[in-house]
A protein has these predicted regions:
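Nucleic-acid endo/exonuclease domains
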Residues: 1-64, 70-115, 119-152, 156-173
């Protein structure tokens, strides 16, 4: 498994080129955030994870079978090997659990997470996926900014505090 690259993979490069061409600027593999996201867009407070379908168990289903525990079924894009199956099932399960934990930590820190799957970047689906990412990023940006401007607007529209008056209406001398 030492030959498996975690940075600069082909799916990651497709997403990077697509976002750059659409005007989005990002940092790569930010070390200070949990999970080491593939792309970090600080302006949008968003982390993008480009996951390989096999390594992260895309659409892998686990169902409980009476007596024997769990039955794991692969998907179209994630086929679990038949040899040494228990090892691969445990590895994929750990990867999925780690991904969930990292995304929870990022959400607690106020970051948004987008997961892009390798199978979504096939030539037939590529443009649609990249447009969906761009739409989601713009939506996040507008939602975050609207919340801040709404807070400012509410503060401005609140009743002014009772200020002391320089001259009283009625005076008794």
């Amino acid at each position: 498994m030492a030959a498996i690259h975690s940075k600069d993979t082909k799916p990651e490069m497709i997403v990077r080129r697509g976002l750059w061409a659409r005007g989005f600027r990002y940092r790569l593999n930010h070390k200070r955030l949990p999970g080491h996201a593939d792309l970090v867009l600080r302006k949008y407070r968003t982390c993008i994870f480009v996951n390989g379908c096999f390594w992260h168990g895309h659409n892998v289903t686990e169902s409980q079978v009476q007596g024997s525990g769990f039955k794991v079924q692969g998907s179209e894009c994630c086929k679990i090997p038949k040899t040494n199956r228990e090892f691969w099932v445990a590895k994929i399960r750990r990867n999925k659990e780690r991904d969930r934990e990292e995304q929870k930590k990022l959400a607690a820190m106020g970051w948004h997470c987008i997961t892009v799957w390798e199978c979504e970047l096939t030539p037939k689906k590529r443009e649609e996926t990249l447009e969906a990412i761009a739409f989601t990023l713009n939506h996040i940006y507008l939602q975050d900014r609207r919340c801040k401007t709404d807070d400012v607007r509410r503060e401005r529209d609140e009743e002014p505090m009772a200020l002391p008056m320089a001259a009283e209406e009625e005076s008794c001398f």
